[in-house]
Amino acid sequence: MTKQFAVIGNPIEQSRSPELHHAFAEKTGVDLNYQKRLAPLDGFESSMRSFFAEGGSGMNVTVPFKEQAFALCDVLTERAQIAKAVNTLWMENGKLHGDNTDGQGLVAAIQALEWNLENTTILILGAGGATRGVIYPLVQAGTQKIVIANRTLARAEQLVDDLKTAVPQAQLQAISLNDLEGDFDIVINATSASLSGDALQLPEKLQFKYAYEMAYGKPSSFLDQAKQRNVPYSEGFGMLVGQAIEAFYIWNGVRPQLKDFL
């Protein structure tokens, strides 16, 4: 019997999840159908529950519903608890289970680029949900120190406070975006600033070996600056594929190889 999956969000037209999951299915021999599902901004829960009531096997959640999905789950993985957001849902024994595969997607993408994560110092620009979701998997992969830089320093400090007990083995630090300096192995852009006209300037006193932009398919002043410095860089398509692979594995018990889809 064909398993039914969906991605839910608002807007949803831009999602590449159906294309990815159908490609994974073709490669692994899993019989599935994967659809986009547009939910009204005030209608996430009813849309999600009706999908599972109709026999749906699993659902991905995208903006703006990840925090709502987190709040509705009966059972959460450790990384979802730390992220306080869920992008992968499934039903088991009548209970709604939730996970967050975004951070694992980022780790898989960085490893596929053969950038080392062991004992690294990483700078993340931005202190929003995207950053919260990747800290724990980065530390699990061996990152030693993570500095979170945000325009509003208090927000970065709050995030560090929230997360330091979850990742006691790593050093977390908050700084203002106005105080960017020092040497880092990897800089990760988790802000939308480089996608809008509000371009982020990386000062000369900030040095780094690699640059990763979480967004993909759009012009990025962050990556333009990495190119000017001749620093190896990547945009976020690998992270998108990586998080989708992790969700596919949770649902179907088989893990496609990231390199086959980049």
Curated annotation (Swiss-Prot):
Pathway: Metabolic intermediate biosynthesis; chorismate biosynthesis; chorismate from D-erythrose 4-phosphate and phosphoenolpyruvate: step 4/7. Its EC number is 1.1.1.25. GO terms for cellular component: cytosol. It catalyses: shikimate + NADP(+) = 3-dehydroshikimate + NADPH + H(+). GO terms for molecular function: NADP binding; shikimate 3-dehydrogenase (NADP+) activity. SUPFAM superfamilies: Aminoacid dehydrogenase-like, N-terminal domain (SSF53223), NAD(P)-binding Rossmann-fold domains (SSF51735). Shikimate binds at residues 15-17, 62, 87, 102, 216. It holds the Pfam family Shikimate_dh_N. CDD domains: NAD_bind_Shikimate_DH. It comes from the Bacteria. Keywords: Amino-acid biosynthesis, Aromatic amino acid biosynthesis, NADP, Oxidoreductase. GO terms for biological process: amino acid biosynthetic process; aromatic amino acid family biosynthetic process; chorismate biosynthetic process; shikimate metabolic process. Gene3D superfamilies: Leucine Dehydrogenase, chain A, domain 1, NAD(P)-binding Rossmann-like Domain. Involved in the biosynthesis of the chorismate, which leads to the biosynthesis of aromatic amino acids. Catalyzes the reversible NADPH linked reduction of 3-dehydroshikimate (DHSA) to yield shikimate (SA). HAMAP family: Shikimate_DH_AroE. Belongs to the shikimate dehydrogenase family. Homodimer. This is Shikimate dehydrogenase (NADP(+)). It comes from Acinetobacter baumannii (strain ATCC 17978 / DSM 105126 / CIP 53.77 / LMG 1025 / NCDC KC755 / 5377). The gene is aroE.
